[in-house]
């Protein structure tokens, strides 16, 4: 299947299916831009039909996750055939003027053997659509995970089913990720097809390593699904937990940093549009999500002269590349006449009056002005500054002399920046002293990203350390904390974690950083199976040993499960005790790996290893 040179105007609108224009195919009208995009010239009728088919398959697979590939294809063909008939021979058909989501849901409801959706199909729109959305299930295990195929078998399958395989890939990804943005799925499908073509092209070449080829290229396919899915889940989690106001504040900060030359009106319009897009996307409404996304991109590129000088090349790209390009574009240069400070938000005599009359607008202007001046700060840090400013005005405007009260705001700000810099400096000191292994042990799940950030940022001077670390670390830490809080919802940890996850998004990281040992936690009992070791601990293969070292951490040479159980057994363990156990663990490993019955030796010597905390 040819790689589609998609243009910048994919628009699956909820408007009428038939539109009176020169373009006869209504879907084509929504899939092709208004004649300004040169890339559209590369889309022939067959490619447009293929693109419509893919979009329909994504929606049906996400809505009816249990359907077979054949059933999804059948429904997608029914919808695309209707679109074709509406423009050629049956323009007066009443269904041709129905919204697309009505047509999609009616197609599902006409299918047999779908008892799960009977109640939804009995409802009227928009309640029917909401019912369908509520049945989407993204939990692990709802659909069996992907099984990694043998490379040779995969290439054989590709050669025999080359034209249908990309569609099958779209189907499998869509039903496992019912909330994943359709543009992401379309994009990774292109990468998947390219990977299969490239790796299987030389399958008969004896010098060609198929496994290595797939191993090298698979991240281009898997990484966007995982990362975009995580970011989307994270954003939707913020929206659900903290509401639209928090999402708007976060986007206001990010857009102001990215486009410092854009005026306040333009920025707030983008903020509102993006917040509305996330509401539709987080509901799982793919049609509205794609329409919102396209309209935002169209607005940004149409008004790029007043938004940013860094996105011209992005706006010349096809849609699927355009969106990613703009998101990853560097921040535009700050206006030459931009003052270094925003003292008017502290010193202005009418500040309390404006705060009382238009609180959210005043705070938005402060965040906008402060963020566009400080691209070196993370979005989370700027939100904390905004929260501090709001609290300051809440307090000071109630007093008789707000001037004296507000003047201390600058000192509070300096203190917060200093504390943030100190955290970064401490982390880098640990990195420089202990190296990668210890750093990986501190951030077990996100090891590779953290060590990359450490090696990149910790070599810089102090004045450049904070910008580098804030930009890279804060997003990663924010994603980690978001995942912790989502897990806390289903498996509560303790009241302190609940407070950090619920009270304030902006203050979540410092709140988590100040958590103490849970005094109500009941330690695990010491049982024979709590610390068990097997022969694989004695591996001599360098690669496995290296992996195990990464798993153990340095200086704590303990396996990941043992480390967890150790802390659960002795939550108040000291650094001295950890050091003693490290030495004993190393000695135990060296001794028992020489024995004939290694596991019996481990079972006996583990008590000696744990003696520093058992005495």
UniProtKB/Swiss-Prot annotation:
Cell compartments where the protein resides: Secreted
Domain of life: Eukaryota
Ranges of residues in domain Albumin: 27-218, 223-415, 416-609
GO MF entry, a single one: metal ion binding
Signal peptide range: 1-15
One Gene Ontology cellular component annotation held by this UniProt entry: extracellular space
Cited InterPro entries: ALB/AFP/VDB, Serum_albumin-like, Serum_albumin/AFP/Afamin, Serum_albumin_N
One Pfam family matching this protein: Serum_albumin
Modification after translation (UniProt): Sulfated.
SUPFAM superfamilies: Serum albumin-like
Keyword annotations of the record: Copper, Disulfide bond, Glycoprotein, Metal-binding, Nickel, Repeat, Secreted, Signal, Sulfation
Residue pairs linked by disulfide bridges in the UniProt entry: 109-121, 120-131, 155-200, 199-213, 236-282, 281-289, 301-315, 314-325, 396-405, 428-458, 457-468, 485-501, 500-511, 538-593, 592-601
Annotated motif Cell attachment site, positions: 14-16, 283-285
Keyword check for Flavoprotein: no
Glycan attachment sites: 137, 157, 472
Assembly behavior: Dimeric and trimeric forms have been found in addition to the monomeric form.
Family membership: Belongs to the ALB/AFP/VDB family.
Record's function text: Binds copper, nickel, and fatty acids as well as, and bilirubin less well than, serum albumin.
Record-given protein name: Alpha-fetoprotein
Species for this entry: Gallus gallus
Highest classification ranks of the organism: Eukaryota, Metazoa, Chordata, Craniata, Vertebrata
């Amino acid at each position: 299947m040819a790689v589609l040179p998609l243009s910048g105007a994919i628009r699956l609108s909820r408007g009428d299916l038939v539109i009176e224009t020169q373009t006869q195919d209504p879907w084509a009208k929504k899939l092709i831009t208004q004649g300004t995009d040169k890339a559209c010239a590369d889309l022939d009728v067959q490619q447009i039909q293929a693109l419509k088919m893919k979009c329909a398959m994504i929606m049906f697979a996400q809505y009816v996750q249990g359907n077979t590939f054949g059933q999804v294809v059948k429904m997608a063909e029914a919808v695309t055939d209707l679109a074709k008939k509406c423009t050629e021979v049956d323009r007066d058909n009443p269904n041709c003027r129905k919204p697309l989501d009505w047509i999609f849901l009616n197609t599902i409801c006409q299918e047999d053997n779908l008892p799960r959706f009977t109640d939804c199909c009995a409802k009227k729109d928009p309640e029917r659509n909401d019912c369908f959305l509520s049945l989407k299930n993204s939990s692990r295990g709802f659909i069996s995970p992907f099984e990694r195929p043998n490379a040779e078998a995969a290439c054989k399958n590709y050669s025999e089913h080359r034209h249908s395989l990309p569609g099958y890939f779209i189907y499998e990804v869509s039903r496992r990720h019912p909330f994943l943005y359709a543009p992401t799925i379309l994009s990774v499908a292109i990468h998947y097809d390219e990977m299969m073509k490239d790796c299987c092209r030389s399958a008969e070449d004896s010098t060609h390593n198929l496994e290595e080829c797939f191993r090298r290229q698979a991240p281009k396919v898997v990484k966007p699904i995982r990362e975009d899915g995580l970011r989307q889940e994270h954003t939707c989690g913020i929206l659900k937990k903290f509401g639209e106001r928090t999402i708007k504040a976060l986007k206001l900060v990010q857009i102001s940093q990215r486009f410092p030359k854009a005026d306040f009106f333009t920025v707030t319009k983008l903020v509102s549009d993006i917040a509305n897009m996330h509401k539709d996307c987080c509901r799982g409404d793919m049609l509205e999500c794609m329409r919102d996304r396209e309209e935002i991109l169209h607005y940004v590129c149409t008004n790029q002269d007043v938004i940013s000088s860094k996105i011209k090349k992005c706006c010349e790209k096809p849609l699927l590349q355009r969106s990613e390009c703009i998101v990853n574009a560097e921040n535009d240069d700050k206006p030459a006449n931009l003052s270094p400070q925003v003292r008017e938000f502290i010193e202005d005599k009418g500040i309390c009056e404006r705060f009382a009359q238009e609180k959210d607008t005043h705070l938005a202007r402060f965040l906008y002005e402060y963020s566009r001046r400080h691209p070196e700060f993370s979005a989370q840090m700027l939100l904390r500054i905004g929260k501090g400013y709001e609290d300051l005005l809440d307090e000071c405007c109630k007093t008789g002399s707000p001037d004296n009260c507000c003047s201390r705001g600058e000192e509070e700000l300096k203190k917060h920046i200093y504390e943030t810099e100190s955290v970064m400096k401490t982390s880098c000191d640990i990195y420089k002293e202990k190296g990668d292994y210890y750093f990986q042990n501190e951030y077990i799940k996100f090891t590779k990203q953290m060590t990359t950030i450490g090696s990149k940022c910790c070599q810089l001077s102090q004045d450049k350390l904070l910008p580098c670390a804030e930009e890279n670390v804060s997003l990663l830490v924010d994603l980690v904390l978001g995942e912790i809080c989502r897990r806390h919802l289903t498996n509560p940890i303790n009241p302190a974690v609940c407070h950090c996850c619920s009270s304030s998004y902006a203050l979540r990281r410092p709140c988590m950083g100040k958590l103490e040992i849970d005094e109500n936690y009941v330690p695990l009992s010491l049982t024979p199976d709590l610390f068990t070791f097997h022969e694989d601990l004695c591996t001599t293969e360098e690669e496995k040993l290296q992996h195990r070292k990464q798993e153990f951490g340095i200086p704590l040479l303990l396996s990941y499960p043992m480390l967890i159980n150790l802390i659960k057994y002795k939550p108040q363990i000291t650094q001295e005790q950890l050091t003693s156990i490290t030495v004993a663990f190393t000695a135990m490993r060296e001794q028992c790996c020489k024995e004939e019955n290694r596991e019996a030796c481990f079972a006996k010597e583990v008590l000696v290893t744990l003696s520093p905390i058992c005495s």
